[in-house]
UniProtKB/Swiss-Prot annotation:
GO terms for biological process: inositol metabolic process; phosphatidylinositol phosphate biosynthetic process; ribosome biogenesis; signal transduction; transcription antitermination. This is Nus factor SuhB. Its EC number is 3.1.3.25. PROSITE patterns: IMP_1, IMP_2. It comes from Pasteurella multocida (strain Pm70).
Length: 267
């Protein structure tokens, strides 16, 4: 096994244990408002600490980029661990059992390893660049549909940028003319993994951060899917808007959503 993958799995499982225990004791949860509609809990922070501890034991010089602490610079800035210690915090707070740990390892700007762990279902999604994607050691492949007919798509709402809601609804209105249904599940990392597993047929969202999607991005691509921004480019880790699906479905989604894009997205 790739040594960094092994450490990423160890870190994800340790963080998952922290989250699962915290989920059982939500009466003790401490919640803080970070910004509009955006919360952080003591479990987010404890999960992050568990991940950092595992990484630092094996790779003390690597740079770590996390949702809660930002960039923790190491001597080796070429290798970056991009972490969301609890993707789906709102679900966690509300008692909805759908959230995950997301860990990506990027080497000189390219994602080499992706790990997403769902501690409630004990599902471990992994990928190494060029070696395929797996769930609990079983190979993953995207659902290779030819068009949008009968597809179920997952998305998220730009709750931190509510000015984008009209565009979001316009995109959904165009897509529902051909697809079967939507799901809004609340964890971008798991949305991407579910695309890779064929549980949903595609995913699109605006306003996500690199730590939400870096691991899931690789998992989709290694499962035979395509990930791009709303213009068909590769800037999604920085722009925060993306589409993920089998290649033909990505093309169909782009054809539907591009007429709805506001000027700031037409670049």
């Amino acid at each position: 096994m790739n040594p960094m993958l092994n450490i990423a799995i160890r870190a994800a499982r340790k963080a998952g244990n922290v989250i699962a225990k915290g989920y059982e004791r939500r009466d003790d949860l401490q919640t803080t408002l970070k910004s509009t509609n955006d919360y952080v809990t003591n479990i987010d922070k404890a999960s992050e600490e568990a991940i950092i501890e595992v990484i630092r034991k094996s790779y003390p010089d690597h740079t770590i980029i996390t949702e809660e602490s930002g960039a923790l610079e190491g001597k080796d800035s070429d290798i970056q661990w991009v972490i969301d210690p609890l993707d789906g915090t709102t679900n966690f707070v509300k008692g909805l059992p759908h959230f995950s740990v997301s860990i990506a390892i990027r080497v000189k700007g390219r994602t080499e390893v992706g790990v997403v762990y769902d501690p409630i279902r004990n599902e471990l999604f992994t990928a190494v660049r060029g070696e395929g994607a797996k769930i609990n050691d079983m190979r993953l492949r995207v659902e290779n549909k030819r068009d949008l007919a009968g597809t179920v798509l997952t998305t998220g709402f730009p709750f931190k940028q509510t000015r984008l809601m009209p565009m979001q609804f316009a995109m959904m209105n165009n897509l529902i003319q051909d697809c079967a249904d939507f799901r809004r599940m609340g964890s971008a990392a798991l949305d991407l993994c579910y695309v890779a597993a064929g549980r949903v047929d595609g995913y699109f969202e605006v306003g996500v951060k690199a730590w939400d999607i870096a691991a899931g991005d690789l998992i989709v691509r290694e499962a035979g899917g395509l990930v791009c921004d709303f213009n068909g480019g590769h800037s999604y880790l920085t722009s925060g808007h993306l589409v993920a699906a089998a290649p033909r479905i990505v093309k169909e989604i782009l054809n539907k959503i591009q007429p709805c894009l506001s000027d700031e997205f037409k670049k």
